[in-house]
Amino acid sequence: MEKTFLMVKPDGVQRELIGEIVKRFETKGYKLAGAKLMQVSNQLAETHYSEHKERPFFGELVDFITSGPVFAMVWEGENVIATARKMMGKTNPLEADPSTIRGDFGISVGKNIIHGSDSAESAEREITLFFTENEIVSYEKQANNWIY
């Protein structure tokens, strides 16, 4: 079963949107395999966003993601990466469709509530950055018989 990494960013945590976001993925039928509230260190932020290191907004990105707690999650299910991207909406909340997370709650590109893996490779990399093997729980979701 495919896995993806999602993270409610500091703005989403401060605005108390964790429950709403988790509910959307549970309602969709996906399985939560790992979750934790954590403070991202500068080192972890720089590693996580290393692909943007040469971009002018890199420093602001690191400052923002380390400015408060985040809620890191691992979700599992069929096509979870692509579906999560659709559920999140476009990066710029002003361009995101209504009923997406960013369309409903996002205000600006810099504070857009949620991060999600964009590929299977990114998901694997991000999951191992934020979670140890022992923090990912493997279990059979009984509702899967009704979903898949």
UniProtKB/Swiss-Prot annotation:
Any single GO BP term: GTP biosynthetic process
In-chain residues carrying the UniProt-annotated modification Phosphoserine: S122
InterPro entries associated with the record: NDK-like_dom, NDK-like_dom_sf, Nucleoside_diP_kinase
Domain of life where this protein originates: Bacteria
Keyword check for Ion transport: no
Function: Major role in the synthesis of nucleoside triphosphates other than ATP. The ATP gamma phosphate is transferred to the NDP beta phosphate via a ping-pong mechanism, using a phosphorylated active-site intermediate.
Assembly and binders: Homotetramer.
Protein name per its UniProtKB record: Nucleoside diphosphate kinase
Source organism of the structure: Oceanobacillus iheyensis (strain DSM 14371 / CIP 107618 / JCM 11309 / KCTC 3954 / HTE831)
Gene (UniProt): ndk
